[in-house]
Regions:
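Gly/Pro-rich hinge or "lid" segments in bacterial periplasmic/extracellular proteins
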Residues: 38, 43, 136-205, 215, ...
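N-terminal lobe/hinge region of extracytoplasmic solute-binding protein
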Residues: 3-57, 88, 163, 497
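Ligand-site clamp/hinge motif
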Residues: 156-159, 187-239, 377-379, 384
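Alpha-helical secondary-structure segments
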Residues: 79-85, 118-122, 126-130, 166-167, ...
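Extracellular/periplasmic solute-recognition and catalytic clefts
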Residues: 92-93, 98, 111, 171-182, ...
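Aromatic- and charge-enriched surface segment that lines or borders ligand/interaction sites
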Residues: 51-96, 114, 120, 267-269
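Surface-exposed binding/hinge segments that line
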Residues: 65, 101-148, 167-174
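Detector for C-terminal structural segments
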Residues: 28, 174-179, 281-314, 321, ...
């Protein structure tokens, strides 16, 4: 058995919730997908599908031929009817069971079972990104009985009820502290393109243990109490390497770790204020003092490794004198305590703490001092992850949002911006049914109407230009998932956006004994 130290335990194993890394880290090892995305080349290959899909001319219809002989851990068969049931649920959700739809399946109309092992998907608009979406955690395939569960059934306390077709099965759950994954001895349907391993997993299983404190995860590695640990903080990377431990910084290839501004809030409605915030933050100082070379400085809202990246570096230079001039021009005058005021109101902004992101609170502390230097008060919203997630959706609670998204797909940016989807900028207000910036939403809708990936890549570049021109975001760094592991661990990899894969892991017994 391999012991894996995780900073956060899963909170939901419903695949559309797999974006949260602790959720995706479990799903990646217990559930398969139609296609497999090579984490190095990002090329798509058959997995549960026998081949890449047959598509029509405008990418609105996709036909998959399903591999025969695949079974779920509960003994049921993975066939076309089961694939249909998976995708119909993920695309549409089910309000009665509190199951939300996947944001990665926009414009999904229906699926159709052609025969026992052939399924066809229909979309109302061109969807060239759909094949890649079939390779990700949010569309992980689960058994029919599992798909009948409600939100509670996918939540902590019910993990052993989740049945996937992956190389591991959840055997035991100690709620909130431990998860035991056991290897399936009959697993024999890995992606044929995988060169590192085929057949059942090499290891017997994985003990996923909660180690919330950074020092506990590092200490467990140094003391040989764990074999692999996730979220090794930057100051600890060198320490582990000095102890002859391995460190892997896996890219997440999507929306960078960034601050983005809820621009409908009155304090951030003036573009000059947003620009002032951007130019007041010294990212080089933050990266050199809190992070390591594993965290490249952000050059756009998208990572350099992301599909569709376009360099925007010139928009984010550190220039606090420019910040002060911009605030002066916008009518914000320093008050008695140095914090700027206008019409009797203080320029006081609240940031969220992004609990899953590395060193979010420490970074805020540095940013707080930098903004104070130009006369802006910065406050940190209090509370745990649940409280933070709720506050981020309310511009009166949080005006500057700290977050990121890992996803290796050209649709990532448009999905992230979409006011009728993720609504990351809170551009759409449901109460008034209005957009603060209609042009931004128009760009999203135009994007999803485009038929070819080339057109979408060009539009992604235009959206990046627009976000920079409007000063809606400050990209901080390209966030990796950093793992530490023992020298005797071989074959440990991640999928395309950094979630752990234990399938090909081997233990060098001789080195382990030493």
């Amino acid at each position: 058995m391999v012991t894996y130290a995780e900073p956060n335990m899963f909170n939901n194993l419903y695949p559309p919730a797999g974006g949260y890394y602790p959720n995706g880290g479990v799903l990646n090892n217990i559930a398969d997908r139609l296609l497999w995305q090579d984490p190095e080349t990002l090329e798509l290959h058959p997995w549960i599908a026998e081949d890449l899909p047959d598509t029509n001319a405008d990418d609105t219809e996709f036909t998959f031929h399903i591999r025969k002989g695949v079974t779920y851990s509960d003994g049921s068969v993975l066939d076309a009817a089961n694939v249909k049931k998976n995708y119909d649920l993920y695309a549409k959700g089910d309000d009665s069971r509190m199951l939300t739809p996947s944001e990665q399946l926009p414009n999904y109309v229906k699926s159709e079972v052609i025969d026992d092992y052939t399924v066809k998907f229909y979309f109302s608009e061109p969807s060239p990104g759909f094949p890649q979406s079939t390779s990700v955690m949010n569309q992980a395939l689960l058994s029919n009985d599992t798909l009948d569960l409600d939100d509670t059934g996918f939540s902590p306390g019910h993990a052993t009820d989740i049945s996937g077709s992956g190389p591991f099965v959840i055997e035991q759950e100690d709620m909130g502290t431990k998860l035991v994954l056991k290897a399936r001895k009959d697993y024999d349907w890995a992606p044929p393109a995988r060169k590192d391993h085929q057949g059942p997993a090499e290891i017997e299983g994985i003990n996923v243990v909660l180690a919330a404190e950074d020092s506990v995860r590092v200490g467990s590695l140094v003391a040989h109490q764990s074999d692999i640990a996730r979220q090794i903080e930057a100051p600890d990377e060198k320490h582990l390497k000095d102890k002859n431990l391995q460190v892997l910084a896996a890219p997440t290839r999507g929306v960078n770790n960034s601050y983005h501004f809820h621009f409908r809030h009155p304090l951030l409605a003036d573009k000059r204020v947003r620009q002032a915030l951007i130019h007041a933050i010294d990212r080089d100082n933050i990266l050199s003092t809190l992070y390591s070379d594993s965290y490249p400085k952000g050059s756009s809202i998208l990572a350099r490794t992301a599909v569709g990246f376009k360099d925007q570096s010139d928009n984010y230079a550190f220039d606090p004198d420019k910040s002060r001039r911009l605030l002066d021009e916008a009518g914000w005058i320093p008050g008695e305590d140095g914090i700027r005021v206008k019409d009797g109101e203080r320029l006081s902004l609240t940031f969220n703490e992004s609990v899953p992101q590395p060193r979010s609170r420490e970074m805020f502390t540095k940013v707080q001092e930098m903004l104070k230097n130009i006369g802006v008060e910065a406050n940190l919203y209090p509370g745990d992850r649940t409280a933070q997630d709720k506050a981020m959706k309310d511009q009166d609670s949080v005006q500057v949002r700290h977050s990121m998204v890992g996803r290796a797909n050209v649709d990532t940016l448009a999905t992230w911006i979409n006011g009728k989807g993720r609504n990351s900028f809170l551009n759409y207000d449901e109460g008034t049914d209005s957009f603060g910036d209609p042009k931004l939403q128009d760009m999203v809708e135009e994007y999803f109407s485009l038929k070819s990936e080339k057109e979408r890549l060009e539009m992604s570049g235009r959206m990046q230009d627009y976000l920079s021109e409007q000063a809606y975001i400050l990209p901080l760094f390209e966030e990796p998932q950093v793992y530490g592991f023992q020298p005797y661990v071989e074959g440990f990899t991640t999928e395309a956006i950094g979630r752990p894969s234990f399938y090909a892991v081997k233990i060098n017994a001789e080195e382990r004994q030493e």
